[in-house]
């Protein structure tokens, strides 16, 4: 059976997340409809990450099995799908993979970046892709808290789901970086896998520390308490980007995140080291 790997980027603003839902527009649903029209049969496509409503992706990876009798080669299907998909979903690459490849099961890790904006807005486009916050932030405290979250821990405190059969709350964070880019703060989170809304909960916690509503010195205690009502908010979805998916452990460990390309278009200042 042929096995194709799609690499997809999308603006999640208009979508109720990745996963197909009966009464809502989703990214997976849009791909399903386009593939079914192209191959004139009911098709399925499986993604590596079930991004939530309003969350964006720079590198979503999906697995697709074309019909065995189909005469359409991958290169032609790629061109056709790029024309069929809406402008806010872009098919970046189509690759032929070994039969056993699975976009979700074979992934060894993912990297997300969350965009925060501090202070007065200079561009009307920013709220679509950022969490807008006041100017005053204690970056040093945020970085101190972030260091205490890197490693292998039970992240129940940072999950929005409880009492799920088979839930494995112990995860490994390989990185939790905070970078300044003018008025923007970029929070990059890398790990082997994540609990439901875990990245947004981590960002919400760091924001509470940065605004000095929580003490960075209490990070380990809050982490290990495994209590979801820990005095911080879940960050809103629009600032979150799935930045990279990894299928090689060495690439996960060596990955260096870059500045999200659209930041330069928003006129909010140059990068700060």
Protein language model features and the residues they cover:
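Structured-RNA-binding interfaces characteristic of tRNA pseudouridine synthases
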Residues: 1-273
């Amino acid at each position: 059976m042929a096995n194709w790997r799609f690499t997809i980027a999308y603006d999640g603003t208009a979508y109720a997340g990745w996963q197909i839902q009966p009464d809502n527009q989703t990214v997976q649903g849009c791909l399903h409809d386009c593939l079914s029209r192209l191959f004139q049969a009911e098709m399925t496509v499986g993604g590596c990450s079930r991004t939530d409503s309003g969350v964006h992706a720079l590198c979503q990876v999906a697995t697709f099995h074309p019909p065995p009798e189909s005469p359409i080669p991958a290169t032609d299907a790629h061109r056709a799908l790029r024309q069929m998909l809406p402008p806010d979903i872009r098919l970046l690459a189509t690759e032929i993979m070994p039969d056993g490849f699975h976009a979700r099961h074979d992934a060894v890790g993912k990297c997300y970046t969350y965009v925060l904006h501090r202070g007065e807005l200079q561009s009307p486009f920013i709220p679509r892709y950022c969490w807008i916050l006041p100017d005053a932030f204690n970056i040093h405290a945020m970085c101190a808290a972030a260091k205490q979250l890197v490693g292998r821990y039970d992240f129940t405190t940072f999950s929005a789901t409880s009492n799920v059969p088979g839930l494995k709350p112990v995860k490994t964070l390989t990185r939790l970086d905070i970078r300044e880019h003018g008025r923007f703060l970029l929070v990059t989170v890398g790990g082997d896998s994540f609990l439901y809304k875990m990245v947004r909960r981590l960002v919400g916690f760091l924001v509470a520390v940065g605004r000095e509503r929580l003490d960075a010195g209490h990070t380990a205690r809050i982490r290990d308490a495994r209590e979801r009502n820990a005095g911080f908010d879940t960050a809103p979805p629009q600032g979150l980007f799935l930045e990279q998916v990894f299928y090689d452990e060495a690439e996960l460990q060596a990955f260096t995140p870059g500045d999200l390309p659209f930041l330069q278009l928003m006129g909010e200042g140059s990068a700060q080291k």
